[in-house]
Amino acid sequence: MNENIAKSISKFLSLVLRHSPEKIGLKLDENGWADVNELIEKCTKKGNRLDAELLDYVVENNDKKRFAYNEDKTKIRASQGHSISVELNLAETEPLEYLYHGTVGKFMESIQKEGLKKMSRQHVHLSKDKETAVKVGSRRGVPQILTVRSGAMYRDGFKFYLSENNVWLTDEVPPKYIEFKS
């Protein structure tokens, strides 16, 4: 399998399954699921050659496990990261005592004042380890790793969810729960 093609398809799937399904005329249900056959057909019509084999490859080999099938592989959705309103039906889960967030220097002043906000997404994304947070932060420049006192947040009433691909999600992280030196 050509990795460049797989990466291109993965990026396109992120666009249509997380942010803009209307770009190809795709309908997602309230839980973010799309019909696999409809997705393949509409992607192909828009010039993104996709078949079941390539889709399987992208879903199974994506390093971040961004996509998931339902049990019979007739539907697909993004695991998290939506900017459109979907209900992922994730159960509230007690987090680890500390979680991590990767960002870059230009956002630090705002984060110190306002904390971590979900911005255009449905949740703030947190990692269980610093290594993952470094990778996330590195996508935009020199990473700054924030340690989040998630256990304290949970005890104070904040809700946490664990996505299908092991990304921790919460609605916000106020500055008092963030350690800025790690």
UniProtKB/Swiss-Prot annotation:
Alphabetic keyword roster: NAD, Transferase
Listed name of the protein: Probable RNA 2'-phosphotransferase
A Pfam entry, by short name: PTS_2-RNA
InterPro entries for the chain: Ptrans_KptA/Tpt1, RNA_2'-PTrans_C, RNA_2'-PTrans_KptA, RNA_2'-PTrans_N
GO biological process, one term: tRNA splicing, via endonucleolytic cleavage and ligation
EC number from the UniProt entry: 2.7.1.-
Job of this protein: Removes the 2'-phosphate from RNA via an intermediate in which the phosphate is ADP-ribosylated by NAD followed by a presumed transesterification to release the RNA and generate ADP-ribose 1''-2''-cyclic phosphate (APPR>P). May function as an ADP-ribosylase.
Source taxon at top rank: Bacteria
Lineage per the UniProt record: Bacteria, Pseudomonadati, Bacteroidota, Flavobacteriia, Flavobacteriales
HAMAP family reported for this sequence: KptA
GO function term, MF aspect, one: tRNA 2'-phosphotransferase activity
Disulphide bridges, residue numbers: none
Keyword Transferase: yes
Similarity comment: family membership: Belongs to the KptA/TPT1 family.
